[in-house]
């Protein structure tokens, strides 16, 4: 009985799927959640992009492709190609992820309360497709320290973005 139960796992609330027990126990493997919205996700996304955008994971700090990008242009949602951030609003917060103080236009990003990991944070998502971008933090003193127009830091996963040069 225990062997049979070990060959199943919960992938989302109320959904159970069968897994290969020979590979399911490997710690480096991550399994994507299966959702009813699967068909709405860009088929060209990498596994890492799917984990970040759809399953709300966070890429490792200091590993993102756009962390040190200084080119002029616009950052778009990697899933739906919606413009989200202008390069002029990007700044170096030294947090390990690209940081922006303002979205490209009001309403491009949606804000949601996130109480995961025992912390109260605000999650930011693409308003068009709902893809997870990262989190927003306020009141950290960036306005005074760097002379930014806003004291807001959008901490964004590079995996959730595509960059288009001007």
Enumerate the language-model features and the residues they cover.
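N-terminal mitochondrial targeting presequence
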Residues: 1-36
């Amino acid at each position: 009985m225990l062997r049979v139960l070990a060959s199943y796992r919960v992938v989302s609330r109320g959904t159970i799927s069968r897994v290969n027990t020979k590979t399911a126990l490997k710690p480096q493997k991550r399994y994507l959640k299966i959702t009813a919205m699967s068909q709405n996700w860009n088929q060209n996304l990498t596994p890492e992009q799917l984990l970040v955008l759809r399953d709300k994971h966070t890429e490792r700090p200091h590993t993102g492709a756009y962390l040190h990008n200084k080119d002029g242009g616009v950052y778009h949602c990697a899933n739906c190609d919606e413009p989200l951030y202008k390069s002029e609003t990007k700044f170096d917060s030294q947090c390990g992820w690209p940081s922006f103080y303002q979205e490209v236009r009001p309403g491009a990003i949606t804000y949601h309360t996130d109480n995961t990991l025992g912390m109260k944070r605000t999650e930011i998502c693409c308003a068009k497709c709902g893809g997870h971008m990262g989190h927003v933090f306020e009141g950290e003193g960036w306005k005074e320290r760097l002379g930014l127009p806003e004291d807001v830091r959008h901490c964004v996963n590079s995996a959730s973005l595509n960059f288009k040069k001007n």
